[in-house]
Amino acid sequence: MALQNEKNSRYLLRDWKPENPAFWENKGKHIARRNLWISVSCLLLAFCVWMLFSAVTVNLNKIGFNFTTDQLFLLTALPSVSGALLRVPYSFMVPIFGGRRWTVFSTAILIIPCVWLGIAVQNPNTPFGIFIVIALLCGFAGANFASSMGNISFFFPKAKQGSALGINGGLGNLGVSVMQLVAPLVIFVPVFAFLGVNGVPQADGSVMSLANAAWIWVPLLAIATIAAWSGMNDIASSRASIADQLPVLQRLHLWLLSLLYLATFGSFIGFSAGFAMLAKTQFPDVNILRLAFFGPFIGAIARSVGGAISDKFGGVRVTLINFIFMAIFSALLFLTLPGTGSGNFIAFYAVFMGLFLTAGLGSGSTFQMIAVIFRQITIYRVKMKGGSDEQAHKEAVTETAAALGFISAIGAVGGFFIPQAFGMSLNMTGSPVGAMKVFLIFYIVCVLLTWLVYGRRKFSQK
């Protein structure tokens, strides 16, 4: 049901003016913060579901399955494929259905892949094709990011959007590390024994109940759905059809900024999905699941910081410096990998933590760039055509939200390509070096792109 059918709802905000200082201080900021924190909770759980397979795949063969390394890397990558594709339509949904309604729907449906995965892992005869379908369904969780970020952008004034988007995206991204921290612990606890879940004995005498890794999120998703229904709002002025939002695809800056976001958020989500499997192949004697959560945790916290410092120092400056460090860490990684020797796990882990840190910081700074740049170019374009300030502001809000959602879809593609690149490189050469060379070159290209287009001079308002 579209927003126009919600005219009499107490959840519909008919007069929303966050740029008005008096309105913001007296009323707006309290409503915006409530919507932000509920959004953070829903998005955090969505990221938990999106990255489920990054923790599940490393344990599948321990409970009776016999999948190849390529198959396991594929399962970790597939949620990012569907998540990236679904982010495109998801980015247009909030102005059509409303942020509250869409958050309720998009959170509730995540219960389906969680329940199904918990059932599937209990039968070692479950076909690989079933896991492919479940992995693709987990991608719906990744799509939530596009609608969530677009929705929150409507609630905050431009001066606070970097911080607000950083908090929403950063703490939402924290779901990756929460899942990778909780899953390895909960699978050894008989949480759902009352449902007849029988664990599989392990060589060390423990009993693994892998279904717990999926089912533990079901009650939390139900609670978050109820919270979104009862505590969030829809904004009447944010209403726009798909036709109103599609012109954003014609903007050159949409595609340039998509590349930058692919390098930052794409790296964060790709490394989150593939790091545990990569570390397991390079350092098989290390129990990586006890350490894997820390990288996504650093990246998620860094995203919030990246948005905040970009509001203060400028997103372009922060992004440029960040890409330089991403390139440096990528180059250092070559020195830590096993070659003729056994490699150095401590150095490998430390350098990867640096990559997670910079990927997180860059995710926050590039999103701040997107919000600022699209607001500027839209206002400039509307006024050049003789439009009023009110019209310019309205179109700027709509185009910025659409751009944030669409660019987030491009960024999510990294969650597929990075694990697949690692898997392909390992399959062809027995080493991930080939994949890392590609990443290093890409980061260098992004340094040049950021500097030449946005850093040296005032960019073209097109």
Swiss-Prot record:
CDD domains: MFS_NRT2_like
Transmembrane parts of this sequence: 36-56, 77-97, 102-122, 126-146, 181-201, 207-227, 259-279, 288-308, 318-338, 345-365, 402-422, 433-453
Result, substituting residue 172 to A: No change in activity
Gene Ontology molecular-function annotations: nitrate transmembrane transporter activity; nitrite efflux transmembrane transporter activity
Source species, domain of life: Bacteria
Predominant subcellular localization, coarse grouping: membrane
Alphabetized Pfam families for the sequence: MFS_1 (PF07690)
Protein location: Cell inner membrane
Regions of this protein lying in the Periplasmic compartment: 57-76, 123-125, 202-206, 280-287, 339-344, 423-432
UniProt GO cellular component terms: plasma membrane
Alphabetized UniProt keyword annotations: Cell inner membrane, Cell membrane, Membrane, Nitrate assimilation, Transmembrane, Transmembrane helix, Transport
Induction cue: Expressed preferentially during the stationary phase in the absence of nitrate.
Name the record gives this protein: Nitrate/nitrite transporter NarU
GO biological process: nitrate assimilation; nitrate transmembrane transport; nitrite transport
Gene name linked to the record: narU
Effect on the protein of changing residue 261 to N: No change in activity
Cytoplasmic topological intervals: 1-35, 98-101, 147-180, 228-258, 309-317, 366-401, 454-462
